[in-house]
């Protein structure tokens, strides 16, 4: 599988190309006198060190690129790697089934949970079917239906956030996009079961918040969370999307900044080079975080859970 190196990773890409070339030569002619294995090992060590150096000093715009990486794991990847017995549930029981949001019942270490998350799609046909991860009102109403079901059966709710934003099409507006988002915000604040939200890629505006009100809010190390995309912000402030890197830095969209502002609880470390380099390791880290969060929330009564969530919401913003 291609790693799809980003622009700032080009020095790493060049080293990896050399490694691939030497490995191919070695396979073609095993009778070569020179010791290719030794050189390949040296280059691999150099690639790891270079990756560490580059990723130790990433800017907000580079993190935004990683959050959108075409090979980055999506909700269904984490469902497959970290959960068991997933049974997908479909439809909002009012209009349609929005494929941009997936949800269903699964087991996390044997415990039944309700999973809800954005799903972008990888190949062209799937991207179109999933609407590039941009939900319509029926997607948010499906999510709310599943949340209410989870509450009835006393199941914790786990959401995965990864969207550029809610779909802004005319049809979505006609069917009540803003109402669907607002209703989810209100109802999520009232749920009597634990709610754990994790930003796994892009956390885009109200489209993200509509499944993002929880008792615990986590972000993967190279994910973003913002009210608008860097390109959108740059287009408004500087009349040019070319200023997106400047906007990304100014907006404070990355996990460390949001944790500093107490908008999120935890940052889940990613494998060296990002989650797409090792989805299995990323899923294991995410699973450990979810289990730790559930253990904390299990100690609270329903009244304590609701009061804590209310206090959390009231603490947002500057005094």
Curated annotation (Swiss-Prot):
Function field: Component of the acetyl coenzyme A carboxylase (ACC) complex. First, biotin carboxylase catalyzes the carboxylation of biotin on its carrier protein (BCCP) and then the CO(2) group is transferred by the carboxyltransferase to acetyl-CoA to form malonyl-CoA.
Protein's UniProt keywords contain Cell division: no
Name this protein carries in UniProt: Acetyl-coenzyme A carboxylase carboxyl transferase subunit alpha
Keywords: ATP-binding, Cytoplasm, Fatty acid biosynthesis, Fatty acid metabolism, Lipid biosynthesis, Lipid metabolism, Nucleotide-binding, Transferase
Pathway in which the depicted protein is active: Lipid metabolism; malonyl-CoA biosynthesis; malonyl-CoA from acetyl-CoA: step 1/1
The protein's Enzyme Commission number: 2.1.3.15
Localization annotation: Cytoplasm
EC class of the enzyme, as a word: transferase
Keyword Lipid biosynthesis carried by entry: yes
Annotated catalysed reactions: N(6)-carboxybiotinyl-L-lysyl-[protein] + acetyl-CoA = N(6)-biotinyl-L-lysyl-[protein] + malonyl-CoA
Chief subcellular location: cytoplasm
Pfam families in UniProt: ACCA
Residues covered by the CoA carboxyltransferase C-terminal domain: 35-296
InterPro entries recorded: Acetyl_CoA_COase_a_su (IPR001095), ClpP/crotonase-like_dom_sf (IPR029045), COA_CT_C (IPR011763)
Regions annotated as coiled coil: none
GO cellular component term of the entry, any: acetyl-CoA carboxylase complex
Family: Belongs to the AccA family.
Gene: accA
């Amino acid at each position: 599988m291609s790693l799809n190196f980003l622009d700032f990773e080009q020095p790493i890409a060049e080293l990896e190309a050399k490694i691939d070339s030497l490995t191919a030569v070695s396979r073609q002619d095993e009778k070569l006198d020179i010791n290719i294995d030794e050189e390949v090992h040296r280059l691999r060590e150099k690639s790891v060190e270079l990756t560490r150096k580059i990723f130790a000093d990433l800017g907000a715009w580079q993190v935004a690129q990683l959050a959108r990486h075409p090979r980055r794991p999506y909700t269904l990847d984490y469902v497959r790697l970290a959960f068991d017995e997933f049974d997908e549930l479909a439809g909002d029981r009012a209009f349609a089934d929005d494929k941009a949001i997936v949800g269903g019942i699964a087991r996390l270490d044997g415990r039944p949970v309700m999973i809800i998350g954005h799903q972008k799609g990888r190949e062209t046909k799937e991207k179109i079917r999933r609407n590039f991860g941009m939900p319509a009102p029926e997607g948010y109403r499906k999510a709310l239906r599943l949340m209410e079901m989870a509450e009835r059966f006393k199941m914790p709710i786990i959401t995965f956030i990864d969207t550029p934003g809610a779909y802004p099409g005319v049809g979505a507006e006609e069917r009540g996009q803003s109402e669907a988002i607002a209703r989810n915000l209100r109802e999520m604040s009232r749920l009597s079961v634990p709610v754990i939200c994790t930003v796994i890629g892009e956390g885009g505006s109200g489209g993200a918040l509509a499944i993002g009100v929880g008792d615990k809010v986590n972000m993967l190390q190279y994910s973003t969370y913002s009210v608008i995309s860097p390109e959108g912000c740059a287009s408004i402030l500087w009349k040019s999307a070319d200023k997106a890197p400047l906007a990304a830095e100014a907006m404070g969209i990355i996990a460390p900044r949001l944790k500093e502002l107490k908008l999120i609880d935890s940052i889940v470390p990613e494998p060296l080079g990002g989650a797409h380099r090792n989805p299995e390791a990323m899923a294991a880290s995410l699973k450990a975080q979810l289990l730790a969060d559930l253990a904390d929330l299990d100690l609270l009564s329903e009244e304590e859970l609701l009061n804590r969530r209310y206090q959390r919401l009231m603490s947002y913003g500057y005094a």
